[in-house]
Each structure stands twice: as structure tokens, then as C-alpha cells.
């Protein structure tokens, strides 16, 4: 197996959901909401792209060589868990209020390592954001989140992540992570 192809970056295609499948002879995009199966277009170095952009919020899965539905391994949103279809998430629509934040010196800072699932009874990023004042009152200067990548089930430490770019849905998904980051700054 060649190692040079996997280092090739994904083609810049925007919301056309590229996937790297160098051994596949055919890759289809399955859209569960309509049942549509769309053949993807082969690109160089083993990349495949959908023939048209997908709107934000569209659920999709890949089928390699006529096989079962597979989630996007680079998905940012897995609303039905790590084995379910992926959903298009457009981070450009997020609203940020932390433009004035300029950071702080790490030297002498009190850093709190936060596990989202156990920090509050709800176990969500939104609930954790509501408790940031509590941490500040304890003298905490910075929060370091333990891994938030998608994993099977509801409870985990995050080190067994499956969808490394997707925020665990039980924590609130990618939009909740953005709200938490905004609140923390």
C-alpha cells in the first residue's frame, strides 16, 4: 500500500462531502430522507466527491461498492450516533460574541480539566457553559475540555472516539460546542 496518497489533502469542494476511498471501484451517496442514491465522482489520489453541494442539515451516508451505509469519517455532526448517517454542518453560520477576547498568559494560570458528561447532571455543553461562573469563583482561569469526539453510547471519557471531528451528540453536538467556546471567552 502506498502511503503517499493518504497524505494528499481533500479536494476543496465545499459542502460536496468528499471521502477518501482509494480501494473503492464505486462510491455512492445515500440521502436517507428521500432514499436517493447518488453516484459520487472520482478524483485523484482516491478521493470521491458528491456531484452537487448538500444543503446544511442534510443527512447522508456513503456506500462503497454497493455495501452498507457508512457515516462520513470526517463528519462534524453525527446526530444519530457514530454509526448513523452524517449531517451537513455549516460553521460559517455561527454567531460569535468573543471578538474582544485577546487571551491570557498561561504562566501561573489555574487550569480546570472539564469532562462534559460528568460536570453537570445534564452532561451537556450548554449546562457546562451555565456553570462557568462557578469555576471563575473557584479561581479557575482556563478550561481544558476532555475529548468531546463522538463515541458509541452515552457515557465515556472521550478517549475511545470514533468520529474524531464530530462532537458527541449527547453533549449537544457541534453548535453546542461553539456556544460553549463563545461563553468561555
Predicted regions and their residues:
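The feature marks proteins involved in alpha-glucan
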Residues: 1-16, 37, 42-123, 134
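Conserved, mostly hydrophobic/aromatic
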Residues: 19, 62, 114, 135, ...
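Short proline/glycine-enriched turn/loop motifs at strand-loop junctions of beta-rich domains
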Residues: 20-27, 55
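Short beta-strand elements bearing conserved aromatic residues within extracellular beta-rich modules
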Residues: 27-29, 60
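Residues that line or immediately flank small-molecule/substrate-binding pockets and catalytic motifs
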Residues: 31, 118, 147
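Short secondary-structure subsegments characteristic of cysteine-rich extracellular domains
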Residues: 128-134
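Alpha-helical scaffolding segments of alpha/beta enzyme cores, especially the outer helices
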Residues: 130, 179-182
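Aromatic-lined carbohydrate-binding/catalytic grooves of carbohydrate-active enzymes
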Residues: 134-179
Amino acid at each position: 500500500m502506498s502511503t503517499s496518497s493518504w497524505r494528499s489533502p481533500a479536494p476543496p469542494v465545499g459542502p460536496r462531502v468528499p471521502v477518501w476511498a482509494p480501494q473503492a471501484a464505486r462510491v455512492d451517496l445515500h440521502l436517507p430522507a428521500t432514499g436517493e442514491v447518488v453516484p459520487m465522482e472520482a478524483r485523484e489520489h482516491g478521493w470521491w466527491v458528491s456531484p452537487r453541494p448538500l444543503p446544511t442539515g442534510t443527512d447522508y451516508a456513503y456506500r462503497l461498492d454497493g455495501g452498507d451505509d457508512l457515516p462520513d469519517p470526517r463528519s462534524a455532526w453525527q446526530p444519530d450516533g457514530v454509526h448513523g448517517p452524517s449531517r451537513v454542518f455549516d460553521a460559517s453560520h455561527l454567531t460569535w460574541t468573543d471578538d474582544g477576547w485577546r487571551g491570557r498568559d498561561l504562566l501561573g494560570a489555574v487550569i480546570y480539566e472539564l469532562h462534559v458528561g460528568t460536570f453537570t447532571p445534564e452532561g451537556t455543553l450548554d449546562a457546562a457553559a451555565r456553570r462557568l461562573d462557578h469555576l471563575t469563583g473557584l479561581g479557575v482561569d482556563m478550561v481544558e475540555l476532555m475529548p468531546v469526539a463522538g463515541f458509541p453510547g452515552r457515557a465515556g471519557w472521550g478517549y475511545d472516539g470514533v468520529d474524531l471531528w464530530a462532537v458527541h451528540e449527547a453533549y449537544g453536538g457541534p453548535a453546542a460546542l461553539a456556544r460553549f467556546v463563545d461563553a468561555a471567552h
